[in-house]
Amino acid sequence: MNRHERLLEELKAYVAADAAEETHRRAMVGLLASTDAFSRAHFMPGHFTASCYIVDGQGRLLLHHHRRLDRWLQMGGHVERDETPSLAALREVAEESGLADLHFPGGAGAETGIFDLDIHAIPAGKGEPDHHHFDVRYVARTRTPDAIAIDRAESNELAWVSLDRAAELMPGPESHRVIRKIRERSPF
């Protein structure tokens, strides 16, 4: 099964937490059916990305202050050629935070399931027009939270924060939905 087929199967089986997330799920299914949805050069309506919320043993989240967007976010980025979204999410976290000790909850395998879905606007920059990221989101745990190392090309700062502080730093409803899910499904 190729990554398009695998993601399509996962999206069709995914149960959204609310109406907004269901709208995102349906749009993602449509994008997969109609385009080269993983291509970074596909701007209308956008392309798939992957991100990951990292939780430590104290229930804190690792956030980074994104250099270009000037916002606190989870780590993530583009899905490379022949890479699944879940593996892309782990790769991006490792590149942006230095953390290699990352585990999806519930098992050692990399394909353990989507945690959240979001579609968000990306402003023009780096020679790219305004477009949307169709973000497939995961949650993973680390046992080595002190091993973080900032990538200054991507981040102004890395910080382990409580879920309450994360909700303050990331005030959007999509972030609050993820934080609510993390609270409901803990411990990780």
Q: Where are the model-predicted features located?
A:
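Generic N-terminal amphipathic, Lys/Arg-enriched alpha-helix
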Residues: 4-15
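Acidic, metal-coordinating catalytic segment for phosphate/diphosphate chemistry
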Residues: 13-51
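Short connector loops at helix/strand junctions that flank enzyme active sites
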Residues: 45-49, 67-69, 74, 131-135
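Residues embedded in well-ordered beta-strands
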Residues: 51-53, 60, 137-139
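Glycine-rich active-site/cofactor-binding loop and its immediate structural neighborhood
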Residues: 55-57, 61-91
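Unchanged
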Residues: 80-174
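Charged phosphate-binding loop/patch that engages nucleotide di/tri-phosphates or the phosphate backbone
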Residues: 170-188
